[in-house]
Amino acid sequence: VKWTDKERAVILGIFSGLDYEDIGPKALVRCLIVYPWTQRYFGTFGNLSTPAAISGNPKIAAHGVKVLHGLDMALQHMDNIMETYADLSILHSETLHVDPDNFKLLADCLTITIAAKMGHCFTPDTQIAFHKFLAVVVSALGKQYC
């Protein structure tokens, strides 16, 4: 993947202003509520029976933060995201058996959550760069499934 200087600046700018403790949980909670079938991967996380239970679940919140911090690896290795995520791809495919389509769903929920937080600053140009970044990450996470 080729990144323009503008794309790099936009992506790094988005993450430099993020409150991981806020955005990570909100994105994962949104995914689990909007796409309830994704809850099956979180059976050990306790009560996920209602949107309120999911929103108030500390294990879900902690995992949302972990997922968002997982994107830091991609930020640090933007020119080699596929190789950077090779081990995570194996983990999610061979050990956790996560349906790779769920990565796209979470990416969409993360985009919505960040757009809501950034408001008018989340311009179409910002979305283009962010979407490209997440598409590369989603592809890297799903690589092992091919």
Curated annotation (Swiss-Prot):
Sequence ranges assigned to domain Globin in this UniProt record: 2-146
CDD domains cross-referenced by the UniProt entry: Hb-beta-like (cd08925)
Record-linked Pfam families: Globin
Coiled coil region boundaries: none
Keyword match ATP-binding: no
Tissues showing expression: Red blood cells.
A GO cellular component entry from the record: hemoglobin complex
Residues annotated as binding heme b: H63, H92
Keywords, sorted A to Z: Heme, Iron, Metal-binding, Oxygen transport, Transport
Gene3D superfamilies with a match to the protein in the record: Globins
Family annotation (InterPro entries): Globin, Globin-like_sf, Globin/Proto, Hemoglobin_b, Hemoglobin_oxygen_transport
Function field: Involved in oxygen transport from gills to the various peripheral tissues.
Quaternary structure (record): Heterotetramer of two alpha chains and two beta chains.
Entries under PANTHER family matching the protein: HEMOGLOBIN FAMILY MEMBER, HEMOGLOBIN SUBUNIT EPSILON
Family affiliation: Belongs to the globin family.
More details: This fish has just a single hemoglobin. It displays a weak Bohr effect that is not effector-enhanced and shows a propensity to form disulfide-linked polymers in vitro.
UniProt protein name: Hemoglobin subunit beta-1
Species for this entry: Lycodes reticulatus (Arctic eelpout)
Upper taxonomic lineage: Eukaryota, Metazoa, Chordata, Craniata, Vertebrata
Gene: hbb1
